[in-house]
Amino acid sequence: MSAFCLTESQAGSDAGAIAATAVRDGDTYVLNGTKQWITNAGEAEFYTVIALTDRAKGTRGVSALVVEKNDPGISFGKKEKKMGIRASVTREVVLEDCRVPKDRLIGKEGLGFIVTMKTLDNARPGAGALAVGLAQGALDEAASFAKERHQFGVPIFSFQAVQHLLADMATRIEAARALVYAVARYIDSGPKDYCKEGAMAKLFPTDMAMQVTVDAVQVMGGHGYMREYPVEKMMRDAKILQIYEGTNQIMRNIIGLALNKEYSRKK
């Protein structure tokens, strides 16, 4: 199991603002800094740490190194209490004079920001796929409930208001599924850059999953709000999909900048 250590208390959406350092010392690098909200922290065996090797160069002075769980100088914070995705562990990763061999450097010094962006570009369609699966589960739960739940002597599925909610849910899911598959096929074709497409494959499906899970709770009414039913958990889990791997506002920034470049070239 591995973990990707990028986020810091002052470096969330602004990945270039990281403060963690990796200083070359002979045949080793000495790492110092704290990474925040790291999935699998304390459980993973390997940690890809994004740190500054040359502060003066800005993002070109960022490098990526591998730290192992048992290396001296690495420790972990408390297990965070989260709104959702409670099945995964989230902790701080603390590096205090953590010394690692120079061959733990990924690629060359200064390539860390590129490693980070490529990692996120590849991870974002995965978040979209998670969103599609989560939303499909919420629809299945809501539709099954609507068939069984009776009000005014008939199943609530027979009410047009409920049918419209379910129809919108199903349509949004299929649209998001098609987008995720299309982007996956595009990435498999080997394009030089797919930053825009990766952002799209995260943005639309994750916004969709949030809406669909909220609507699933609405279809189920008071039952949906209770912890005995899974849709309230699905709604809580859906929220993080709009936040991690780059917030959906950042996704819109990425898409907008890419479109601006594309249409500038067409003039």
Residue ranges, per PLM feature:
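A short, Trp-centered hydrophobic/proline-enriched beta-strand micro-motif
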Residues: 1-6
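Flexible, small-/acidic-enriched active-site or ligand-binding loops
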Residues: 72-99
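Short, surface-exposed charged micro-motifs
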Residues: 19-21
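Short Gly/Pro-enriched turn/cap motifs at secondary-structure boundaries
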Residues: 10-13, 37-40, 54-56, 82-89, ...
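A short core secondary-structure module
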Residues: 16, 28, 32-76
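Basic, amphipathic alpha-helical recognition segments used for DNA target recognition
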Residues: 67-72, 102-103, 136
